[in-house]
Regions:
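N-terminal first-folded block
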Residues: 6-37
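Enriched for short, Lys/Arg-rich terminal
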Residues: 2-5, 9-13, 17, 50-84
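A short, surface-exposed loop/turn module that caps and links secondary-structure elements
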Residues: 27-53
Length: 84
């Protein structure tokens, strides 16, 4: 699991409890893969992209290319600025 530089930068602006949830999500992505239906408002955005809410105001978006082991978290930030 890889966090892009822009996602890491936005994550630093999150409240501590939300950052802890992001770390938990990253751990679960590492263990279980890109499908995370137990997370709040989880949905598949496209064939290879997914998102969930870390809290009411904060979301994470990630992608996993077919036949790839890499999961890239490309957005972790406010819901208002989410790229979907």
């Amino acid at each position: 699991v890889e966090l892009t530089k822009s996602a890491a930068k936005k994550a630093r602006q999150m409240p501590k409890s939300t950052r802890q949830d992001l770390v938990l999500l990253l751990e679960e992505l590492e263990k279980e893969g890109p499908m995370q239906p137990e997370w709040s408002n989880y949905s598949k955005l496209s064939k290879n992209e997914y998102h969930c809410h870390l809290s009411y105001s904060w979301v994470a978006c990630w992608r996993n290319e077919k036949n790839s082991l890499l999961i890239e978290v490309y957005y972790a930030g406010s819901r208002e600025n989410a790229p979907y």
